[in-house]
Each structure stands twice: as structure tokens, then as C-alpha cells.
Amino acid sequence: MKKILLTLMFVSFLNANSQNPVQEFNFNGNLNSSDNTISFLGSPVFVNDRAGTPRGALRLTNKSFQAVVGDLPQGNKPRTISVWVKYNAVNTPNYILAYGTAANAQYFGLVQQAGAGSSSDAVLSGWGAGNDVVASVPLTKEIWYMYCITYDGNVSKIYRNGELLKSVDGIVRTTKGYILSVGKLNNTTSINADIDDLKVYSVAMTDEQVIEAYNSSKPAGSAAAETKAVSGPVKKVAAAAASTPAKSAAPASETNKVVKNVEVFSQGKKIIGANASNIGDLPEGTYLIKVSN
């Protein structure tokens, strides 16, 4: 029992520590970071956000903004950037966000290319075709999407609405620069969209953490994100705790004890047969532990 409690406490600590952004911009009527230490520069136009809150999102119509963010991960350091986007036009490229230097592998940005039919390329831009991660996805105007781009020092990933679109390993990134831009790619401005809740992390969030971030911030009434089993290492995990215990089978000597249902996952897949009673038999590693009634 002590081992189980220590494991859950450790997992909870990792989850809380890893999912705290180093900078966050909510665009709730201003361009300031959530801690009011820095701000984007420019004359903004604010519109309803994905929940319908007035002046809760920033409208970018062929207009860009920049901010000096000293917390932007440099070189090949791990990182995650997430943002909510609603496109008002999809017939031209939307340069959502970026930072770094316009040189081979020294850039880190997010682009949604112009639509071709009902689809479009979502791009994690690293400056240079060999440094980009490109995934073709359906694209519709007037719908809010949540994007996440991550890099752990080796593996680059791009997500939308909690779903992993593409993962590429082996790209050596040497990102250099502390100016964060929205609405432009290097010196070129091209965007017609509303953006909200831009967050910068100094860790590469796991697949499970990205799904959790999407589910916890999507507007009410949104369809659940489609999730798929994906390859690649899972370096951090998230634990969900229930408040009301449920009874489960136990030896005769413990029939008066009440326990919770514990499910164990590794790399997005449930480990069949793993539960609270035999968690100590699992091989060494990092797991997602789900506790429920």
C-alpha cells in the first residue's frame, strides 16, 4: 500500500510540475501575460472567445504582434507550445506563431497552410524542409481548434484537438531567439484568425497530457477528441483521482476494506491485468495511473 501511495504522489507531482506553463497569454481584453510581466506590442482587436466570452480572444487580420519572452526554450531544450485558433479564412496561409532565427533548424513555429479542398497542411516549422513536421488535416472556417507542438530534444510532434497528427524523430533543433511572434513567419505576415490561450512550457508534454489539456479547456458541447495509439516514449504521466471509493474484490481477511479501481497505462495502452494489488510487479518505468470508482 505504501508503494502505491508513493507512486501516486510521485505521478501527481510530475503532472502538476510539467503542466505549469512558463508563460501564458489569455488575451482577455489585453495583450499581457497572465502574470503581467510582459506584453505583446500593438493595437489589438478583441472578440468572443471559444466559450462566447466577450473580448476573450485576439483577432488577427493580416496583422502580427511580437513580445520578448525570456522563457522561450533555446537550442535543443524540451518545449511545448499550445494555442487555440479559429480561422476566419482558409484560402491563404495562417502563420499562427513562431520564434527563433530564420536559419536551418534554428526556428520553431506553427503554420496552417492554405486549404486545398477541405484539407490543409498543418506544419511545425523548423526552417528548412528537412526540419519541418507536416500533416494533412481537414480544415473548416469558424471552428475552434487547439494545437500543440512539442519537442523533447529528439522527437518533434504536432497535435490538434488532443490527437497526434504526426511525430518525427531525429531532427536536431538549435532554436535561437527570444522574440515570440503571432501572425507572422519570419518577416512575412499572413493570417485571418482568432487566437486564444497561448501557453509556453519548458517540457515536452506527453500524449496523455496533451489530451488532458484539450479535454479540460475545450468549449462545452464540443465533440470529444479522437485519440489513437501512437509510438514513441512517454516521459511523463498524469493521474486522475476520484473522490468516492468503490468496493472491489478482496481476500476474506480484507473484506471490510474499501479500495478504488486502478488502471495502468503505458504509451497510451492499458496494461491488461495490472491493478492496485500487483502494481509492484510491473517492470521499472513511467506509467499513467487512472484511479476511478
Identify the residue ranges that each predicted region occupies.
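Extracytoplasmic low-complexity segments
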Residues: K2-L8, L14-K63, I211-V237
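Extracellular glycan-recognition modules
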Residues: N20-F40, N62-D121, V155-S156, T189, ...
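Beta-strand-rich interaction surfaces with strong enrichment in secreted/lumenal proteins
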Residues: V68-L72, V134-L139, D169-I171
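A glycine-anchored, Pro-Gly-centered beta-turn/N-cap motif
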Residues: K77, E142-I143, P283-T286
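Short, aromatic/His-centered strand-loop micro-motif at the edge of beta-sheets
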Residues: A122-M146
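Short tryptophan-centered beta-strand motifs in secreted/extracellular beta-sheet-rich domains
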Residues: E142-Y151, I158
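Flexible glycan-contacting loops in extracellular carbohydrate-active proteins
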Residues: V168-D194
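C-terminal outer-membrane/trafficking sorting elements
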Residues: S231-N293
